[in-house]
């Protein structure tokens, strides 16, 4: 769907970032035109002063709307649904909207910390474990978030064990079971019934990573939901590939180190 008189949308993102993938999916499902500027997390562009002026949290994504910065992927997607209401991606009923928000919060509170364990172990550990104490201290000084500072310290000095990663994947598997519960309750074909919503989008980046780590572990109703999702035009338009391949793409397509003004 085309949107007349849409504002200028600039998305700062990384191809393999789960939160960035959520926003790209929403932009794609809305049929919006946007400019993408890729941040190379491996080179810590998200911790640079110029990027922290856009997103003080020093994380991706950030969406500029006519130059106004929006942050936090769930909040960005709710803005997009309110600003561009067709097709709608939130239920009309306030109680059902609450359920979608509750699901999205569960994803952020539970599944994001879980997926960080395999993701960071794969990509960040090889970088961080080479740092001297002085290099680690310098990197940590540029990171606004205490949680992220703790993660980088963990990667550098006490990386996640195989058991911790397996427990994290168990959490993601439980998320897929919860999708099955919602599908059974709503009757499908989507998490909250016949309408594709932000709840489906919130889960998708975590399902794709779970499928990469534990292929073939989706229960039949969830696997059918997932195939329906993959068949949507928005999935192809969001350009979600393999985790490592998308990391390489972010490295190749990153903005200059000096940054680009939105």
Predicted regions and their residues:
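GST-like domain detector, emphasizing the conserved glutathione-binding G-site
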Residues: 1-144, 185
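Generic surface-pattern signal
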Residues: 56, 105, 112, 120, ...
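Short, hydrophobic secondary-structure boundary micro-motifs
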Residues: 87-92, 114-115, 189-194, 236-241
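GST-like fold's C-terminal all-alpha helical module
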Residues: 111-227
């Amino acid at each position: 769907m085309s949107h007349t008189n849409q504002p200028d949308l600039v998305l700062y993102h990384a191809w393999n970032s789960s939160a960035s993938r959520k926003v790209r999916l929403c932009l794609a499902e809305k049929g919006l035109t946007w400019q993408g500027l890729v941040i190379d997390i491996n080179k810590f562009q998200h911790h640079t002063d110029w990027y922290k002026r856009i997103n003080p949290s020093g994380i991706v994504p950030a969406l500029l709307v006519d130059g106004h910065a929006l942050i936090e992927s769930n909040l960005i997607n709710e803005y997009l649904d309110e600003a561009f209401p067709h097709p709608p991606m939130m239920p009309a009923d306030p109680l059902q909207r609450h359920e979608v928000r509750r699901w999205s919060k569960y994803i952020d509170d539970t599944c994001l910390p879980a997926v960080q364990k395999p993701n960071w172990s794969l990509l960040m550990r090889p970088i961080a474990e080479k740092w001297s104490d002085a290099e680690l201290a310098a990197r940590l000084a540029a990171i606004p978030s205490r949680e992220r500072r703790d993660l980088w310290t963990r990667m550098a000095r006490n990386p996640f064990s195989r058991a911790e990663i397996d427990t994290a994947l168990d959490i993601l598997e439980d998320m897929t079971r919860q999708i099955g519960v919602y599908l059974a309750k709503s009757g499908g074909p989507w998490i909250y019934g016949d309408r594709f919503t932000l709840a489906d989008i919130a889960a998708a980046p975590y399902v794709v990573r779970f499928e990469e780590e534990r292929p073939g572990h989706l229960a039949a109703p969830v696997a059918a939901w997932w195939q329906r999702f993959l068949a949507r035009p928005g999935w192809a338009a969001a350009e979600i590939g393999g985790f490592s391949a998308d990391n390489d793409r972010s490295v190749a397509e990153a903005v200059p180190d000096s940054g680009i003004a939105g």
